[in-house]
Swiss-Prot record:
Protein name from the UniProt record: Photosynthetic NDH subunit of subcomplex B 4, chloroplastic
Membrane topology type: Single-pass membrane protein
Lineage of source species: Eukaryota, Viridiplantae, Streptophyta, Embryophyta, Tracheophyta
Knockout or disruption consequences: Malfunction of the NDH complex.
Role this protein plays: NDH shuttles electrons from NAD(P)H:plastoquinone, via FMN and iron-sulfur (Fe-S) centers, to quinones in the photosynthetic chain and possibly in a chloroplast respiratory chain. The immediate electron acceptor for the enzyme in this species is believed to be plastoquinone. Couples the redox reaction to proton translocation, and thus conserves the redox energy in a proton gradient.
Length: 175
């Protein structure tokens, strides 16, 4: 069995900046002596000013090196393979976009899938429909039954009082 591990390192990290480069020289038919030294100096100052403010996220020549090291059982030799990848800003953007889209797809797909726990008797044993509103509906049903029972008891007491009052009147009339 071969054991392997992989490491990623940044090698020869050189971040280019615009003030290291000289400004572009125009060599067209209209380019002549009239383009004075002051204009070139102004252009150089603008390039330096922009270099202090504007930076790209990653330079185009950022090498990412993958080192694969394998050690074979019973052997003392180590086999090393090096691969260098240069990732551009567009490639990094594509990787992140793929990750975001894959994550959104996973959330939508697995969010809409059936869940055996919520469909089980353990969860719906009390009569729930999975929405959560059944708790309030059940509570309202219990309260409605309790009110109906209370009204029934009050009505029975009121009828008994009236019947008792009528009996007293009948007894008073008969005496």
């Amino acid at each position: 069995m071969a054991e392997a591990f992989t490491s990623f390192t940044f090698t020869n990290l050189h971040i280019p900046s615009s003030y290291n480069h000289s400004p572009k020289q125009n060599s067209g038919p209209n380019h002549g002596y009239w383009l004075s030294k002051n204009v070139n100096e102004k252009r150089e100052r603008n390039l330096m000013r922009g270099s202090l403010c504007v930076r790209k996220a990653l330079p185009h020549d950022l090498p990412l090196m993958a080192v694969m090291v394998q050690q074979i059982e019973g052997m003392r030799d180590i086999i090393t393979e090096k691969h260098v990848w240069h990732l551009s800003d567009k490639a990094i953007k594509n990787v992140y976009m793929f990750y975001i889209m894959f994550t959104c797809w996973g959330c939508l797909y697995f969010g809409s899938a059936k869940d055996p726990f919520y469909d089980s008797e353990e969860y719906r044993g009390d009569g729930g429909d999975g929405t959560g509103y059944w708790v309030y509906e059940t509570q309202e049903d219990i309260e409605e039954k309790a009110r109906a029972e209370l009204w029934r008891e009050e009505l029975i007491e009121e009828i008994e009082q009236k019947v008792g009052g009528l009996r007293e009147l009948e007894e008073a009339v008969t005496k």
